[in-house]
Amino acid sequence: MTNSIVNKVTGDIFDTEVLPIIPKDIKKVTKWQFKWAKELPFSEVYKLVVVGNPNILQGLIAIRDEKTHYYMALIENAPFNIGKSKIYEGVPGNLVAFACKKSFDKGYEGFVSFDAKSALIEHYEKTLGAKRAGRGSLMYVDTQAATKLVNRYFK
């Protein structure tokens, strides 16, 4: 179980869990930015949901086991969790912490890599503790940052 997401309006805190996506979930992501059905053959896809309410997807993550670390292919907030009018905060942090936890569980020391949009590189450095791998868009979460994320988001 992950620690929580926070309702931005009321301040209420909700326990969450990360579950594998099931086929009926794909029908619910038609208005999302990414084409999640196309990712299923290549990645493990998981959903973040409020405990006891698995039918409302708060966010999704697609990860791939690269045998030395996990690669985060996609991550996305639900449309209602984007922008200034978003309902819940904490969705992406929960999902990245989940990927880090899986990396620890596989013996990869928490390492997770991903390609970042250049406009978000600084944001990921601040919020996730991610680092750039060279000058390009490839970033990674190392053991130290992964430990902080897992400790923050997992009970």
Regions found by a protein language model. Give the residues of each.
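Non-catalytic substrate-recognition and accessory regions of acyl/acetyltransferase enzymes
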Residues: 1-86, 94, 101-111, 115, ...
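Short beta-strand-alpha-helix junction that forms the catalytic/metal-binding core
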Residues: 91
